[in-house]
């Protein structure tokens, strides 16, 4: 068997930090899939032994695809799946054509892992429920469940792992991404530099707001609470951001920016109501 599938990045239309609970911050966000030039292509086939190939920037044990497979294997064991079903994961040859940059706020590693879990469930006809896939996805990484969901637009809550479809006109073909070369943002450093400015109470209002309205009425620092700490901790990012027009928005903890296609400088005229 040979299966090939494409994986697209996400952007955060808005990302609002609520409060810290345990080691991590609770948040609310709107994630949208972006089908533009950036995509990873993953091929999965049966082989004599396991292999995972791709231009990855981390050791195998830290790779999100490898992590997803270990979590999946343990899950199948806990559900008493047959020995042959579990063994089938040990003879997969997985190859990734990697184009989505990492440390860019685009969910690159999570996209690959989420896509793999979603597609393996179909390839092997395991009939795992979305909830079961989500329980594994949240162990891989906070953004993974958005990619498992296959939604084009969704609200993410809790630590980012609770996903709810958001019904709206999809923006997947209307957005373009700018991912600066050689500028990497450390999510950990940015969260450490984050300082809450006000007590955030507008959760429900944000989660109801259409993405297009957010982009047309707010500027990038109003939409993303991590922009300021990212600029504080990264000089290269600061240099790039200062040159960008108002139509550009910041995704995740960076370093990528995105905008509506065919928007000009100064396209955002009205002020965001927070």
Swiss-Prot record:
> Would the keyword ATP-binding be found if you checked this record's keyword annotation?
yes
Pathway note: Isoprenoid biosynthesis; isopentenyl diphosphate biosynthesis via DXP pathway; isopentenyl diphosphate from 1-deoxy-D-xylulose 5-phosphate: step 3/6
Concerning InterPro entries, the annotation shows: GHMP_kinase_C_sf, GHMP_kinase_N_dom, IspE, Ribosomal_Su5_D2-typ_SF, Ribsml_uS5_D2-typ_fold_subgr
Citing just one GO molecular function, the answer is: ATP binding
Q: Name one GO biological process term.
A: terpenoid biosynthetic process
Q: Which Pfam families match?
A: GHMP_kinases_N
Q: So what does this thing catalyse? A: 4-CDP-2-C-methyl-D-erythritol + ATP = 4-CDP-2-C-methyl-D-erythritol 2-phosphate + ADP + H(+)
Sites where the protein binds ATP: 101-111
User: Keyword annotations for this protein?
Assistant: ATP-binding, Isoprene biosynthesis, Kinase, Nucleotide-binding, Transferase
The EC number(s) attached to this protein equal: 2.7.1.148
UniProt-annotated catalytic positions: 10, 143
The answer, when asked if Kinase is one of the entry's keywords, is yes
Which purpose does this protein serve, as stated in its record? Answer: Catalyzes the phosphorylation of the position 2 hydroxy group of 4-diphosphocytidyl-2C-methyl-D-erythritol.
Q: Which NCBIfam families match?
A: ispE (TIGR00154), PRK04181.1 (NF003216)
Q: Which family does it belong to?
A: Belongs to the GHMP kinase family. IspE subfamily.
What's the protein called, per UniProt?
A: 4-diphosphocytidyl-2-C-methyl-D-erythritol kinase
| UniProt source species | Helicobacter pylori (strain HPAG1)
What's the name of its gene? ispE
């Amino acid at each position: 068997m040979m299966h090939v599938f494409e994986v697209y990045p996400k952007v955060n239309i808005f990302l609002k930090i609520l409060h810290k609970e345990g080691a991590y911050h609770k948040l609310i966000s709107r994630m949208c899939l972006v089908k533009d030039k950036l995509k990873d292509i993953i091929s999965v086939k049966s082989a004599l032994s396991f292999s995972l190939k791709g231009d990855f920037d981390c050791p195998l044990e830290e790779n999100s695809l490898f992590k997803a497979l270990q979590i999946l294997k343990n899950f199948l064991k806990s559900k008493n799946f047959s020995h042959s079903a579990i063994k089938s994961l040990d003879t997969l040859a997985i190859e990734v054509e990697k184009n989505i940059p990492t440390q860019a706020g685009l969910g690159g590693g999570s996209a690959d892992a989420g896509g793999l879990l979603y597609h393996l469930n179909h390839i092997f006809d395991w009939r795992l429920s979305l909830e079961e896939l989500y329980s594994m996805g949240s162990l891989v990484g906070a953004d993974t469940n958005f990619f498992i969901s296959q939604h084009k637009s969704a609200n993410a809550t809790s630590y980012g792992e609770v996903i709810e479809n958001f019904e709206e006109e999809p923006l997947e073909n209307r957005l373009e991404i700018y991912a600066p070369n050689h500028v990497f943002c450390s999510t950990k450093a940015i969260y450490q530099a984050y300082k809450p400015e006000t007590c955030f109470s507008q959760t429900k209002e944000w989660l109801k707001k259409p993405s297009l309205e957010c982009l047309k009425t707010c500027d990038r620092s109003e939409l993303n609470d991590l922009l300021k700490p990212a600029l504080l901790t990264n000089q290269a990012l600061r240099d790039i951001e200062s040159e960008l027009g108002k139509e550009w928005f910041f995704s995740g903890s960076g370093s990528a920016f995105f905008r509506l296609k065919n928007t000009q400088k100064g396209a955002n005229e009205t002020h965001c109501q927070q």
